[in-house]
Amino acid sequence: MSLVTTSTSNGICTVKINRPDKLNAMNSDVAKELIKTFENLDKDDNVKVIILTGEGEKAFSAGADIEYMSKISPDESVAYAKTGQLVTATVELVKQPTIAAINGFALGGGCELAMSCDIRIAADTARLGQPEVTIGIPPGWGGTQRLMRIVGIAKAKELVYTGKMIKADEAKEIGLVNQVVPLASLQEEALKMAQQIAANSVMGVQMSKVAINKGRNADLDT
C-alpha cells in the first residue's frame, strides 16, 4: 500500500496521505514519500495546481506519529525532525499553487503541513491546532513562524501556548483557513478552486506565488 497517492486530471494533481487507520499521521516513511512526491511534481510542467488532502473523513493529518517517535533513538528523532522541516519547506516551495483540503484533524505537523499550502479549505468537521506543548515540545516543523505570519503574533502565541484545538469556523475567523464547507462537498469545492486557478496563465500564477512568498518580509523596492 502506497503511503502517499497521486491522481492527476486536466492539470490538477490530488495528493493524498494514505494512512487513515493512523489518522494520516506522518512517520518517517510518509514524510520522505511526501518530499519525493512534491519534488517530482515541481518538475512536472503538466501539473498546474496541487490539492493536498488526507485519506478518509477523519483526518487531514494528525501530525507527527507519536507511536513511531516513542520507539526511535535520540539520533533518529533529530533526523525525523529535520525530515519534517524538509516536508513543509518542500510543499511551500513547490512551483505550483497548492490547496490544502482539510478533511478532519490537522494537528501539530498536520497543521504545519496545511499552513505550508497556499490556500486552505476546511471541512466543517475539521479541527486545527498546535498541541505540541502538551507533550513537552514546541512546534518543530515551521509552525511557529508560519502560524504567526498567517494569524498574527498574538493569536499564534495563544494557540501555541495553550495547545488547544479550534473548530473550522474559528479557524476561518482568524484567517487560518480561507473557506469552510460541508465535509461532503470538500473535495468538490477544492477542485472548483483548483480549476479556477488552472484556467489562468501558468507563468503568471507561478511568478505571483514567488513574488508573494519572497515579498512577505521585503519592501516595495525589492
What spans do the regions from the language model cover?
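Glycine- (often His-adjacent) and acidic-residue-rich active-site loop
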Residues: 3, 54-90, 106, 136, ...
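C-terminal long alpha-helix characteristic of the crotonase
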Residues: 121-126, 177-222
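Acidic, divalent-metal-coordinating active-site segment for phosphoryl/phosphodiester hydrolysis
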Residues: 164-170
